[in-house]
Amino acid sequence: MEIVDYKCVYFTFGRFQPPTTGHAENFKAVKNTAKGCDWFIYLSQTVDNKGSNPLDPDRKLYYAKKMFPNFAKHFRSGPKDPVAILKELQTEGYDDAMFVVGSDRVQAMQWVKRYNGKDFFFRKLDVISSGDRDADGD
């Protein structure tokens, strides 16, 4: 009998503009949910001059690593959206991918599963909750 060892990854993706202590709860949830699988925190590339996305990607990554050194090696910046992230993860050899989002975003992010088998292929792909968002997290 052949034993198949699937390579799994858990990830989250967000603006994190700017990174806050409230985001740390999301980061912890990704780590804890991964249970032995690889896990990453993707920082969006979004930046504008309107005030809601003031940090450019490099500056945001710098602050995230300074604020959360325990998560520093798991931060990634580059792919601009969840589909691009999943394409990247597939090229890295992952078989299973779990997109971890706040409970208020689970339904809204189900659309990524429509691309499985088209733009990328994962044996298992799901969108799961990191838990309820802390309204007071700053």
Q: What is the meaning of each model-derived region?
A:
Residues 1-138:
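Nucleotidyltransferase catalytic core that binds NTPs
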